[in-house]
Curated annotation (Swiss-Prot):
Alphabetized Gene3D superfamilies for the sequence: 1.10.150.130, Intergrase catalytic core
Name the UniProt record assigns to this protein: Tyrosine recombinase XerD
Gene name of this polypeptide: xerD
Function: Site-specific tyrosine recombinase, which acts by catalyzing the cutting and rejoining of the recombining DNA molecules. The XerC-XerD complex is essential to convert dimers of the bacterial chromosome into monomers to permit their segregation at cell division. It also contributes to the segregational stability of plasmids.
Limits of the Core-binding (CB) domain: 13-97
Pfam families: Phage_int_SAM_1, Phage_integrase
Compartment(s) of residence: Cytoplasm
Native source species: Ralstonia nicotianae (strain ATCC BAA-1114 / GMI1000) (Ralstonia solanacearum)
Length: 308
């Protein structure tokens, strides 16, 4: 005999409406992905249901309610999960304050839970080479994809930066790209190597012109319709080529950026140089990659040292 699920208290209409309006605003203003919006809605709904047990709606939240809620959820939450909820609640109540749904922000005293630094997943150099070689360069789209992957691995650009690149921002003769308005609104110059430069030239000569036909575009990397690439499209390509290259390692949209940083450090690059290339404001962000490099060195030592 199965046990009945505990009864869930119905949400006050004002809470349901506020959550929906907030998610609509995020979709319109920030263009957040559906999965992200669903996670935000789920976190807020769970809290609103818990709060309904106290006879309150979301707009009646007080500091003590949030403190009690996080204390109640502490035992079943990772620090990263708790921090995500804090971020969601802060955004929601800051929005609610702007919309005059609340008179004060009850999240102002919420502290961040400590969590260990997340070591980014990366690929070996052999795996990157296999990924780079996966596109069919006899086709215009394959040329585009090869040039994109070459450039990302050669420069460490963020996905959002590489899809936003304009043709005029690439200096082929100088071997640099100019990133306009990167993370934090900062511009920077990032070098790339001769191999990436050769593939960019080939793409511009044979691939981009074939994709555009009689059309014109500012974007460096274009689709078959002549539009600029999107982050989602690039991520789809990386997953497809990883499958073609028989790569089963965990991937993310920034896999090549992580590989760029880790492989530079493995080959003795200075941490400050890598920080500048990645566009990190704080070197502690870059230091995460040293954990990957150290683990790789330990593995090599264990495999190849006679007393490993």
């Amino acid at each position: 005999m199965t046990q009945a699920a505990p009864e869930t208290l119905p949400l006050p209409p004002s809470s349901t409406e506020a959550i929906q309006r907030f998610c609509d605003a995020l979709w319109l203003e920030d263009g957040l992905a559906r999965n992200t919006l669903d996670a935000y809605r789920r976190d807020l709904t769970l809290y609103a249901q818990w709060l309904a047990g106290r006879g309150k709606a979301l707009d009646q939240t007080e500091d003590v309610d949030l403190s009690d809620y996080f204390a109640a959820r502490h035992e079943d939450s990772l620090a990263s999960t708790a921090n995500r909820r804090r971020t969601v609640f802060k955004r929601f109540f800051q929005w609610a304050l702007r919309e005059h749904l609340v008179s004060a922000d009850p999240t102002r005293l919420l502290s961040t839970a400590k969590q260990p630094p997340r070591v980014p997943k990366t690929l070996s150099e052999a795996q990157v080479e296999a990924l780079i070689a996966a596109p069919d360069v006899d086709a215009p789209l394959g040329l585009r994809d090869r040039a994109m992957i070459e450039l990302m691995y050669a420069s460490g650009l963020r996905v959002s930066e590489i899809v936003a690149l304009k043709t005029v921002e690439v200096g082929l003769n100088e071997g640099v790209v100019r990133v306009i308005g990167g993370k934090g609104g900062k511009d920077r110059l990032v070098p790339f190597g001769a191999e990436a430069g050769d593939w960019l030239r080939r793409y511009l000569r044979d691939g981009r012109t074939a994709l555009l036909g009689e059309r014109t575009a500012d974007a460096l990397f274009v689709t078959a319709r002549g539009d600029g690439m999107t982050r989602q499209a690039f991520w789809y390509l990386i997953k497809r080529y990883a499958q073609r290259a028989d790569i089963h390692a965990p991937l993310s949209p920034h896999t090549l950026r992580h590989a760029f940083a880790t492989h530079l450090l493995n080959h003795g690059a200075d941490l400050r140089v890598v920080q500048m290339l990645l566009g990190h404001a704080d070197i502690s962000t870059t230091q995460i990659y040293t954990h990957v490099a150290r683990e790789r060195l330990r593995t090599l030592h264990a495999q190849h040292h006679p007393r490993g």
